Amino acid sequence: MPFDHAHWQERFDALRTEHHVPGAALAVFVDGDLHELASGVLHRGTGVAVTTDSVFQSGSVAKVYTATLVMQLVDAGELRLDTRVADVLPGFAVADAEVARTVTIGRLLSHTSGIAGDFTLDTGRGDDCLARFVDACADVGQDCPPDTVISYCSTGYAILGRIVEVLTGQSWDDALRDRLFTPLGLHQSMTLPEEALRFRVAMSHLGELGTDPEPAPVWDMLPRSAGPYGRVLITAADVVRFARMHLDDGVAPDGTRVLSAASAALMRQQVAGCLDTWSFMATGWGHGWALYDWDGVPGYGHDGASGGQFSYLRVVPGSGVVAALLTNGGVATSFFTDLFRELLGELAGVRMPEVFAPPAEPRPIDVAPLAGTYEREGGAP
């Protein structure tokens, strides 16, 4: 079905307002064409409008970029999925010595290492930030044993970023620029705040659900060491261009092969299923991509969150549709869900599941036996 720009702009504006999202950008690739929409403001304090070339923070969508760099190294023969981290990073340590000795690249890519995932540490702005971060992982424990379940692990992606540095001889930032941004023509994608100053940049907003949020106290809440798992600075169109390369099995729009077809397929081949499909909205995970099953229609993508900004990327290979939504606050997940249920339903024939919520008439449950203090490794009680 042709993309009706006026209709989708109207729905985009209405749903953004309904869900108190200050500003958003949307890019959709369908029937061989790229369509871009913008709505709202970059900063509620200044009133500067969002445009289609505005730059937002990616959050965890950055993980797919890092996974792609790793799979390029697999293509080059520098790595295998069963390569042990310790074989690339001598002296690598986490709290569990056996995990440190045996954990593999594949387990980090697929979130099946069991390593505690939310270890965050500001190791400075220098090019040594990832090396210092990995050194500091020696006391990081396990959320669960390896290969037990999907245990979402940002820590593992920082470690993968350091592996990219060691094998390329470049910083992660430079490797990303030279190996992905440049060959794909992603001219408005970057990793550092000073690079983003050249463009119209979205400010994060924070506030109570159901109210119009206010600008965050600072623009960037992540340290540089978070780059491989959480900080690529992007436009919606650039995200779609990146995902199109995966849709086309590793080939850029100009015909340049960026990734082998085999590696592109491995990234979206399920390694493990999600037990908690409500939190992730995914049915499983590959070597980088979150995987979806929309009533029998397969897809892949990733979500991201970064201090008040939220990003959503979905690919429907059967219909050749790619869509990316970037937002700067508000009830973004509800905005995404309502918009993409309509958008993918019309353009890709996808029926997304209803949002997980309590039943209209919940039955009484005695919660007394469940009361207590719960704690997970790497997190507060």
From Swiss-Prot:
Subcellular localization(s) per the UniProt record: Cell membrane
UniProt function note: Involved in cell wall biosynthesis and may also act as a sensor of external penicillins.
Protein's name according to its UniProt entry: Penicillin-binding protein 4
Gene that encodes the chain: pbp
Cellular component GO terms, alphabetical: plasma membrane
InterPro entries: Bact_CellWall_Synth/Modif, Beta-lactam-related, Beta-lactam/transpept-like
PANTHER family noted in UniProt: BETA-LACTAMASE-RELATED DOMAIN-CONTAINING PROTEIN, D-ALANYL-D-ALANINE-CARBOXYPEPTIDASE/ENDOPEPTIDASE AMPH
Keywords, alphabetical: Cell membrane, Cell shape, Cell wall biogenesis/degradation, Membrane, NAD, Peptidoglycan synthesis, Transmembrane, Transmembrane helix
Pfam family, one: Beta-lactamase
Family: Belongs to the beta-lactamase family.
Lineage: Bacteria, Bacillati, Actinomycetota, Actinomycetes, Pseudonocardiales
Transmembrane segments: 271-291, 315-340
Membrane topology: Multi-pass membrane protein
Protein origin, superkingdom: Bacteria
Binding site for NAD(+): G299, Y300, G301, H302, D303, G304, A305, S306, G307, G308
One GO-annotated biological process of the protein: cell wall organization
Active-site residue numbers: S60
